[in-house]
Amino acid sequence: LYGKLQHLESMPPYQGGGEMIHSVSFKQTTYNEVPYKFEAGTPNIADVIALGTAIDYLNSLDRHAALNHELGLMEYASLKLSELEGVKLIGTAPEKASVVSFVIIGLNALDVGMYLDTMGVAVRTGHHCTEPVMDRFGIPGTIRASFMFYNTHAEVDVLIAGVTQAIDLLK
């Protein structure tokens, strides 16, 4: 917590519990000193430890190999999606992140995303905070799949199968 001490001391706590209390009686509650009076309950120790472990794991990876794997998955998915009738890839710059955005002509992106969800495939749908750009190009929304070092070609194949089924079912 950051602030001028005089202001922090004059502010009342907004939560109660744990180490933020100095003493409690039936007549009065006395709050601890700054910053402790704003730290209700037990700190989130388990998640801090988990974050440290995750950071250690990520630091142990060969980042170059991970990036190459991610880009390989993106290229594979792009190739397979481009082979499907009615699928149009959006954003095909040669150097980009391991993300594939696409539309299926005649289908609503949200409907496709919901169908893929029933298959256990997680995608994002919609404007992705780029509504003015999509409006400019007449795109009502896209389906976006992203790939990380832990994804596999088999998972991309499940995505492709799901998109194929969605086209057959929803068209």
Language model regions located:
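Pyridoxal 5′-phosphate
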Residues: 1-171
